[in-house]
Amino acid sequence: MSIYANDWDNCFPRAGSLTSKWGTTANWQADNRSNAFGLKSDGTGGSATISSSLYLLVKYAEVLPKSFICQSGDLRAKKFNPAKYGVRDKEFEDLWDFGPEPAKHCSYSYHMCYGPYPLSTASSDPGQAVAVDRNPWLDPYTDTTGFKWNDQTKTGGRENIKGYQKGNSGLHKREGQNVLFLDNHVYFENQSFCGVKNDNIYTYWNGSDIRQG
């Protein structure tokens, strides 16, 4: 991640254009960036998945797709193999995303880069969370039934502990998640509100309690 930022004016990976929205990748096997993300003729607009931004590390930083699988906790994600999707004439670096079903080939969540405040090593807080084990709210295999953000009791019996742990990633038995911070350190956090000023790393802040999103 740091190598990429050093090569790209301190900016972290961000697929598409500066005005692309979070959505789907138009054509993950396209021959050029415009077709891959559905950009306009002037190079603006389009949409991209979060995983396509991570895939830029495959294209430009020599990271292998297998590096995006959590070997210790994610038993469902499989190493990306383009041949399984009928693509046999291109190398990994020729593509733009982890196939048509990227969630099956990437275990990690990445900060929301499609917005007014993308991460930069030059201007962002070193305590900012950059990447983390998969978001439980976007993971079809993770049960968040009954979880309430205003019930974060971490004391008492086993059920209380299991309750607040529902805000954690589904990997690692809901005990916490590995978080990569901007200053390059990785820490296993046992709660999801571990960002700057206790920001919840899995949710979008609505202006109220930053721990809830």
Name these PLM-found stretches.
Residues 1-213:
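Short, well-structured segments within or immediately adjacent to enzyme catalytic domains
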